[in-house]
């Protein structure tokens, strides 16, 4: 027998184990994008899924993690993605990092838009300088051409974000505006922004 853990603002309630089965039916929690018949690293697609689907609900997820800590869990069954049966501490730790808006890895994301290529040159030059100065991870994202969800994912993964853009009709370039709005909608915080 299972009973639901009420988590406000989650698409579906998570169900906590109450029997000997020790299964957490996690609804959208611990889900990920991708096919189940393809072996791949869980974290990348789960991170993208989290910040695309669940990310703005960090506080309710934190509350859920606290409630779930009172149960012995041997299996996590999300609606989307594989059933998790091994090294559950790894998955729970990542969810704790993501839902508390903590930095997962040190690194810099340079997100840019460029109309004539000059802002792109500046972004690439900055990436080169950062690498020369010893920054171990630098990711450069062209917001007009690269995957939007991956840009959001990287912004939440790393501790520093640099935004480089042009103006458009006396305003922020539309792709940059969409990116900033996407970060704001997901409660982006605890990062250094330049």
Where do the language-model regions lie?
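Metallo-beta-lactamase
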Residues: 1-86
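Conserved hydrophobic helix-helix packing surfaces used for dimerization/oligomerization
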Residues: 23, 108-110, 193
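Short N-terminal or domain-adjacent regulatory/targeting segments
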Residues: 77-104, 178-179
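Short gly/ser/thr-rich secondary-structure transition/capping motifs
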Residues: 93, 140-146
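Residue-level signal for short, function-critical loop segments
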Residues: 114-116, 167
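Short, highly selective alpha-helical patches that border small-molecule cofactor pockets
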Residues: 119-123, 127, 176
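Short helix-loop-beta junction
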Residues: 124-139
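Helix-loop-strand module that forms the ligand-binding subsite of alpha/beta enzymes
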Residues: 145-194
């Amino acid at each position: 027998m299972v009973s639901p853990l009420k988590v406000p603002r989650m698409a579906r309630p998570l169900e906590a184990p109450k029997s000997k089965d020790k299964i957490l039916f996690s609804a959208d929690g611990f889900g990920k994008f991708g096919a189940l018949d393809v072996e791949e690293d869980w974290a990348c697609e789960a991170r993208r899924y989290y910040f695309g689907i669940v990310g703005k609900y960090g506080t309710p997820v934190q509350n859920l993690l606290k409630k779930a800590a009172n149960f012995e869990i041997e299996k996590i069954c999300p609606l989307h993605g594989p059933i998790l049966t091994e090294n559950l501490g790894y998955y729970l730790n990542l969810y704790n990092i993501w839902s508390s808006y903590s930095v997962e890895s040190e690194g810099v994301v340079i997100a840019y838009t460029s109309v004539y290529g000059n802002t792109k040159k500046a972004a690439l030059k900055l990436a080169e300088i950062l690498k020369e100065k010893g920054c171990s991870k630098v990711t450069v994202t062209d917001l007009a051409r690269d995957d939007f969800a991956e840009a959001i994912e990287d912004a939440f993964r790393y501790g520093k974000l640099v935004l480089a853009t042009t103006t458009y009709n006396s305003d922020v370039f539309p792709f940059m505006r969409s990116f900033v709005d996407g970060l704001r909608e997901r409660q982006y915080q605890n990062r250094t922004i330049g």
